């Protein structure tokens, strides 16, 4: 008949890449023409098109926030008040998950991880739901999922779900280059048992397989099983920096903590008290901390665990010592030989552009000012970052979590397009 005709084909990705699905879909097209009556049609054109399902992409602390999520509980008014002030002053939206929805589960970071998918014609956020399935488990599906907000989860059928499956144990670095290899979307970071351990807790294989299968943010496994809760966000985070590198790695450091306390003692402040104002049963002097040989031995062990991870991160992210800032944080070790923060863990912070929401450490005061806050503020001011200290002592720290554990941030996507990566 002649003339022109156009036909549109649409392909919808219904599954993310995973261990058993590479994410590639092949479609073969053939244009046939009739020949003589009674004979098969013959091809005049054929082509094959391969589609790749868009991967799920995580967003690091260096990307701009869009909105912040926290829970409201019967006992976290003080925390919520501090978070509300920080988020409003930073110019972002705060979304509060109320108690009828969270049912007393305050650990917003542990239940979900925000990411996104991207294509030449559309992009939208996708939340990854943790297999921890606490009382917050209905929140991502009932509240977040929508026409332009995706949802994905992985269920561990044949594996035991542990604390390491909570997403305080799932982070992502800013973009890095290692030995000439670019990671323009950064690298995923998870915590697992020590490589040679015969026993220990790990992130479930079904979640690890999913993360590896996305291919665009090749994961790094750190050793986090030395912690009682076992999350990487208990000893590390990233903050933006105004230089070519673009970020700094912050690490908890007992050595830096003891250096600070010894300095206070040498300057005549040995009787200054930790946890001042939190009750006589909490208070302890600098002299008492420094004379506690058991605490010192515990922190030597913790420092060796963090040093192992420091070396892994330097190697896998292409970092020098100048790219790392050590924060003065002490730990103590429980009966199970696993560590928890001795005072509110300042590395477990929320990063909102140049504003940091940091657990208030209740350190010893010198001339009316907390020495730990003064040191932290000094370290961050050099990067142009502003510190807000949030009281999470009773409502989070005492329950073995801090500010980062109790909050979550949805961020803007990368400007870099994943399909420009060599895969």
Short names for language-model regions:
Residues 1-423:
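Histidine/cysteine-enriched polar flanking segments
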């Amino acid at each position: 008949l002649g003339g022109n005709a156009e036909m549109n084909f649409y392909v919808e990705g219904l599954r993310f890449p995973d261990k058993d699905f590479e994410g590639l879909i092949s479609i073969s097209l053939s244009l046939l023409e009739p020949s003589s009556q009674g004979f098969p049609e013959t091809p005049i054109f054929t082509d094959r098109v391969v589609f790749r399902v868009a991967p799920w992409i995580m967003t690091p602390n260096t990307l701009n926030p869009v909105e912040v999520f926290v829970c409201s509980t019967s006992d976290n008014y003080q925390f919520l008040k501090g978070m509300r002030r920080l988020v409003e002053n930073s110019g972002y939206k705060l979304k509060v998950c109320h108690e009828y929805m969270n049912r007393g589960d305050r650990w917003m970071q542990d239940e979900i991880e925000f990411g996104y998918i991207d294509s030449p014609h559309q992009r939208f956020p996708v939340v990854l739901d943790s297999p921890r399935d606490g009382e917050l488990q209905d929140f991502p599906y009932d509240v977040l999922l929508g026409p332009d907000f995706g949802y994905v989860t992985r269920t561990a059928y044949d594996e035991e779900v542990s604390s390491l499956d909570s997403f305080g144990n799932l982070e992502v670095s800013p973009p890095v280059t290692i030995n000439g290899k670019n990671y323009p979307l950064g690298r995923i970071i998870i915590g697992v048992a020590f490589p040679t351990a015969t026993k220990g807790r790990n992130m479930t294989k079904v979640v690890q397989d999913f993360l590896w299968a996305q291919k665009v943010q090749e994961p790094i496994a750190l050793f986090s099983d030395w912690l009682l809760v076992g999350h990487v966000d208990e000893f590390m985070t990233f903050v933006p920096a105004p230089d070519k590198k673009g970020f700094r790695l912050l690490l908890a450091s007992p050595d830096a903590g003891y250096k600070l306390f010894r300095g206070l003692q040498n300057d005549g402040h040995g009787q200054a008290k930790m946890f001042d104002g939190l009750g006589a049963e909490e208070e302890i002097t600098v002299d008492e901390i420094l004379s506690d040989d058991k605490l010192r031995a515990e922190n030597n062990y913790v420092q060796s665990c963090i040093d192992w991870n420091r070396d892994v991160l330097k190697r896998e992210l292409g970092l020098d010592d100048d790219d790392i800032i050590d924060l003065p944080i002490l730990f103590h070790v429980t009966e199970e030989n696993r560590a928890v923060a001795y005072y509110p863990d300042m590395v477990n912070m929320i990063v909102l552009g140049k504003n940091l929401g940091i657990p208030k450490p209740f350190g010893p005061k010198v001339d009316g000012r907390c020495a730990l806050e003064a040191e932290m503020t000094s370290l961050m001011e050099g990067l142009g970052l502003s510190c807000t200290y949030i009281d999470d002592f009773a409502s989070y720290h005492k329950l073995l979590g801090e500010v980062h554990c109790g909050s979550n941030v949805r961020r803007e996507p990368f400007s870099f397009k994943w399909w420009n990566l060599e895969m």
